[in-house]
Amino acid sequence: MEEVIERFLKYVKFDTQSDENSNTVPSTDKQLKLGKNLVEELKEIGLSGVSIDDNGYVMAYLPANIEKNVPALGFISHMDTSPDMSGENVNPQFVKNYDGNDIVLNKDKNIVLSPKDFPEILKYKGKTLITTDGNTLLGADDKAGIAEIITAISYISKHPEIKHGKICIGFTPDEEVGRGADYFDVKKFGADVAYTVDGGDFGELEYENFNAASAKITVHGRNVHPGSAKDKMINSISVAEEFMRLMPKEQAPEYTEGYEGFYHIVDFQGSVEETKLQYIIRDFSKNKFEDKKKLMLDAAKFINEKYGRNLVEIEVKDQYYNMKEKIDEVKYVVDIAYKAMEEVEVKPLVRPIRGGTDGARLSFMGLPTPNLFTGGVNFHGKFEYIPTFAMEKAVEVIVKIVELYAEK
């Protein structure tokens, strides 16, 4: 299974960071470089219908080798990495036979991956880990998923004794900025059901996710020389702070877990004259999700009424919804994945996704798509890592799912 590791190391060398502020599709041209590379690799494997469209979506399929009518099965991952941290010049480090102590990622900058801060790493004592060098994210989200899917499909194509229906694979741009499914052609993809391989911890199986929205707030001020500012100046930074204080502090990401939702400020740029804020809003409950959006709108209204002028402009935009209602209609897709994990000695961890995947949107576009683990941990930052055995097991799970569908 060295193959999956080699692929992963190759893919993370591509800088594919997406950009929320871009209006192009994909949001960054550099995602296309990886996409075109994947196209050539899929052709070499011998897949059919290999293509990359103008929007950067890569698709291909392996034809069925049985006559039995079974659902066409899809596997999907995304090519972009998070805007939250650089994905340029990723330099993976191997930690073999992890001993349970601190891992020095970057000695010069004193960046340490410590069990004191990330106690879950102790689960992987004795295993080989791939970490960052402390300067970038790693890109396991979701280049590990791409490597796992391609390795599994390559293995199946080389072993005709493995019976299977049609297997479709797709790699999307811009998932990290909530646009991964925007131009996904479900009909062209050709699957009846699918799985994203975009989860985290070893064994994760997910079919519930956040309802998600973004909020962009612009606060207008009035700049006057501070020496003569009394009763004249309106400091937009101060007004923005007022707005922030109206958000429930206990409902921030750092205070929530499980099925709890949150408000998360992700950007703050300001001067006296103008301040811009960006939030993301998340909740599993549709009602609580709507309440959270309303609270933000009401906060803007309250401040504008307080000052007697429209200082605060707010735009709230839905991004994706909880896929559970769609997956429940075809629950067998979860049951088969659960069984596949058990058969290859992976303990399934069925839990809600405290985030989103392309599968959330795709499920509402007629393609039910739960989420499988990649094995990665601490996504979107310099403390990201992935155990190599988890990647190898993810490949086994994909192959076993394919086999079980052929028996359906």
Curated annotation (Swiss-Prot):
Q: Which Gene3D superfamilies match?
A: 3.30.70.360, Zn peptidases (3.40.630.10)
Name the protein family: Belongs to the peptidase M20B family.
Name the positions where Zn(2+) 2 binds. Answer: D141, E176, H380
The species this protein belongs to is Clostridium acetobutylicum (strain ATCC 824 / DSM 792 / JCM 1419 / IAM 19013 / LMG 5710 / NBRC 13948 / NRRL B-527 / VKM B-1787 / 2291 / W)
Q: Which residues does the record give as Zn(2+) 1 binding sites?
A: H78, D141, D198
The record describes the protein's role as:
Cleaves the N-terminal amino acid of tripeptides.
- The catalytic residues are D80, E175
Question: From the UniProt record, which GO molecular function terms apply?
Answer: metallopeptidase activity; tripeptide aminopeptidase activity; zinc ion binding
Root EC class: hydrolase
Chain's gene name: pepT
Tell me yes or no: is Aminoacyl-tRNA synthetase among this UniProt entry's keywords: no
What are the alphabetically sorted keywords of the record?
A: Aminopeptidase, Cytoplasm, Hydrolase, Metal-binding, Metalloprotease, Protease, Zinc
Cellular compartments per GO CC? cytosol
What name goes with this protein?
Peptidase T
